[in-house]
């Protein structure tokens, strides 16, 4: 399964990428929402993990644009974020996100959490 990971913090991006690769995923990484929109058509990911707060375009705007485009709307979006308050999670789900994973995340179980959200 191919994941597109959008995370602007290099250390978090590295840990998430290594954790997901160890869990058997193919991982493509980018640093912001604009880069997600630029590469989603060519990379054709099975799911997208989005950081909430990123430069240039945040995760919410990115998710909104992905879900508004018929070509990318079916791709599951999972937020990977420190902002997991109930109202913010509800907002993400209302935009069409499949779920949210809180930061800091457990590197040993990140891949399993992604699979659980995608299976729901």
Language-model-detected regions and their locations in the chain:
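C-terminal output helix
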Residues: 105-114
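Active-site residues of response regulator receiver
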Residues: 51, 81
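Short, glycine/charged-rich "phosphate-handling" switch motifs in NTP-dependent
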Residues: 98
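Conserved acidic carboxylate
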Residues: 7
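Short hydrophobic/Thr-rich beta-strand motif most characteristic of the beta2 strand and flanking loop
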Residues: 24-31, 39
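Charged docking surfaces used in two-component/phosphorelay signaling
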Residues: 14-22
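Receiver (REC) domain active-site loop signature in two-component systems and cognate sites
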Residues: 54
């Amino acid at each position: 399964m191919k994941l597109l990971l959008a995370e602007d913090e290099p250390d978090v991006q590295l840990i998430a990428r290594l954790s997901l690769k160890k869990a058997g995923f193919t991982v493509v990484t980018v640093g912001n929402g604009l880069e997600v929109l630029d590469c989603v058509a060519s990379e054709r990911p099975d799911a997208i993990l989005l950081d909430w707060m990123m430069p240039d375009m945040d995760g919410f705007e990115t998710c909104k644009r992905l879900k508004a485009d018929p070509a990318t709307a079916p791709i599951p979006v999972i937020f990977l974020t420190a902002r997991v308050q109930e109202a913010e999670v509800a907002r993400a789900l209302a935009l069409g996100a499949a779920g949210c994973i809180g930061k800091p995340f457990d590197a040993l179980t990140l891949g399993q959490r992604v699979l659980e959200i995608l299976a729901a």
